[in-house]
Amino acid sequence: MAKESVKARERKKQATVERFAAKRKALKEAGDYVGLDKLPKNASPVRLHNRCKLTGRPRGYMRKFGINRVTFRELAANGKIPGVTRASW
C-alpha cells in the first residue's frame, strides 16, 4: 500500500492538470511557448503516473480496470470482477 501522502500528491497533480487543460491547449495551438513555460510544472499531463485505485501501487497498472495486476488477480480469483474468468482450453 502506498502512503496516503503519496496518493494525495498524485490526486493534487491530477486536479492541477484538469484545471489548466483548456489554457494549456489554447497556448499550444497558438504556439506560445513562453506562456506554456509560465504554467505550473504539475499542469503537464506527462507528470502524472497511473496508480491503483485500491492500493495506490504505481507499478503493474492495468488501464482497463484501473487497478494493479496483484489486486486484479486477487479480485478475479474471488469472482469480484464481472465478466472475468480464468482461461481454460
UniProtKB/Swiss-Prot annotation:
Entry-linked SUPFAM superfamilies: Glucocorticoid receptor-like (DNA-binding domain)
GO BP annotation list: translation
Oligomer status and interactors: Part of the 30S ribosomal subunit. Contacts proteins S3 and S10.
Function: Binds 16S rRNA, required for the assembly of 30S particles and may also be responsible for determining the conformation of the 16S rRNA at the A site.
Any single Gene Ontology cellular-component annotation: small ribosomal subunit
Family statement: Belongs to the universal ribosomal protein uS14 family.
Protein name: Small ribosomal subunit protein uS14
Keyword tags: Ribonucleoprotein, Ribosomal protein, RNA-binding, rRNA-binding
InterPro entries: Ribosomal_uS14, Ribosomal_uS14_bac/plastid, Ribosomal_uS14_sf
Pfam families the UniProt entry points to: Ribosomal_S14 (PF00253)
One term of GO molecular function: rRNA binding
Keyword RNA-binding tagged: yes
NCBIfam families attached to this UniProt entry: PRK08881.1
Organism: Cytophaga hutchinsonii (strain ATCC 33406 / DSM 1761 / CIP 103989 / NBRC 15051 / NCIMB 9469 / D465)
Statement: the UniProt record of this protein carries the keyword ATP-binding: no
